[in-house]
Amino acid sequence: MSLLREAERCLVNRKAFASLNAFVTPLDRVGSWIERVKDADARRKRGAPKSSLDGKLIAIKDNICTRDVRTTCASAILENFTSPFNATVVELLEESGAIVAGKTNLDEFGMGSHSTYSHFGPVKGVRADDLGYVSAGGSSGGSAIAVATEQCYAALGTDTGGSVRLPAAYTGTVGFKPSYGLLSRWGVVAYANSLDTVGIIGANTSTVSEVFGVLNRYDHRDPTSISKATRSRIDEITGSTSKTRSERLRIGVPIEYNILELDPFVRETWRKSIQHLKNQGHTVHPVSLPATKQALSAYYVLAPAEASSNLAKYDGVRYGTRDLDSPDNTGGYLYARSRGSGFGPEVKRRIVLGAFSLSAEAIDNYFIQAQKVRRLVQSDFNKVFRLHNPLLQATLTSHPKALESDGDTAEKVDVLVCPTAPSPPPLLCSLENAAPTEAYTNDVFTVPASLAGLPALSVPVTPGDREQESPLGIQVIGQFGDDQLVLDVGSRLEKMNIQ
């Protein structure tokens, strides 16, 4: 099939699934992109494509800046904002020949777990018979639905505490959060700087790997981008240990993830996924991550604290839509009404929560303690992986000792395998009267990897005896920089029939 025909098929699907509300700003049916796709077709026929993404439609989450399309963050305060520049990841996609397929819907400023907190209306998952629509997950729900319904080849999202992996788990797609700092954040509207990661959603791990290969570049404009020297060291460490680990991997199963609230179908899918890897010749080992129990609480202190600082600039003066001054505004705050009407309820909730945790009265008891928990979470992961964390000082002097981490390496594992979400996607109607904080628990399995900055992948798995059921997300977590191994293990789960 020609690239132009593929693009036209995506547009047909977009019209067919318009009710799911995946896009804030869709790609126009006519425009200069058509000629670019035709040029890509010609290059492919000559055997000289720019990349494997040449001429492919890639959707962009609407909190990633694009010069030619508005960037709203699904918020009223940025409803008419158009960036004067492209984000680095968008630049890299366009240099590879990819076509921006529009901007996808999300929870406002990336704050949510079901993509319902959007100024442009909620994103809807597939219908569950006569019960209504199910959740598409959040906050990158629009990107996930766009991929799941073949409205694009792949999509970019952002993952702060699971915002790419959870939608992937709910929509039967593959969602990948790379190691923190590998993909540039320059041009990505910040939610929580120390956690935000550009993620990739695709129909399979092969597609995700293609996009990752294009975007995995150092960017001098991003102060959190991993330097070229560190990238070389990571490549040397992971390359030198790949032969040591060989094809027989040690698969870790975190015992703390087997919680009482875990849905029985999710638990059974997890068990069969582990058995499937065991049948392939890999060994399975229980591991303990004790700080995991405090990870979710720490996350919902740290992320809102950073958000309250990042969102202070949206006042209608420097950024954002300016609302009319209120006649009863006796406090003299020029921006009070602009922020009050511009932000939605969940964003306001997190701003207040973050401002409190950073206050002089609370910072020691909340923010500082949460930072300590974060370090404990990172330490727990470092203790269970055979590969030493390349960012630690020990690797600076002698990378051949990369496997000599704390304790006996024979007892350590290569990757962790666990559920992505504790339950299948809920019905949207069931969320209407639920307490806002109930949605926070959906991130319980995704937050730990985010706090530690580790690569994590959600792949759809359907047990062979439950093929009538929608697939569930199984998560693969690896050591920092071991992104390729995470993708490899994910492909083994994805391709095989789990019995």
Curated annotation (Swiss-Prot):
It is an enzyme of class 6 (ligase). The keyword Oxidoreductase does not apply. One of its GO terms (molecular function) is glutaminyl-tRNA synthase (glutamine-hydrolyzing) activity. The active site is at K61 (charge relay system), S139 (charge relay system), S163 (acyl-ester intermediate). Keywords: ATP-binding, Ligase, Mitochondrion, Nucleotide-binding, Protein biosynthesis. Its main location: mitochondrion. It catalyses: L-glutamyl-tRNA(Gln) + L-glutamine + ATP + H2O = L-glutaminyl-tRNA(Gln) + L-glutamate + ADP + phosphate + H(+). It comes from the Eukaryota. It is found in: Mitochondrion. SUPFAM superfamilies: Amidase signature (AS) enzymes. One of its GO terms (biological process) is mitochondrial translation. The keyword Protein biosynthesis applies. Pfam families: Amidase. GO terms for cellular component: glutamyl-tRNA(Gln) amidotransferase complex; mitochondrion. InterPro entries: Amidase, Amidase_dom, AS_sf, GatA. Its EC number is 6.3.5.7. Subunit of the heterotrimeric GatCAB amidotransferase (AdT) complex, composed of A, B and C subunits. Allows the formation of correctly charged Gln-tRNA(Gln) through the transamidation of misacylated Glu-tRNA(Gln) in the mitochondria. The reaction takes place in the presence of glutamine and ATP through an activated gamma-phospho-Glu-tRNA(Gln). HAMAP family: GatA. Belongs to the amidase family. GatA subfamily. This is Glutamyl-tRNA(Gln) amidotransferase subunit A, mitochondrial.
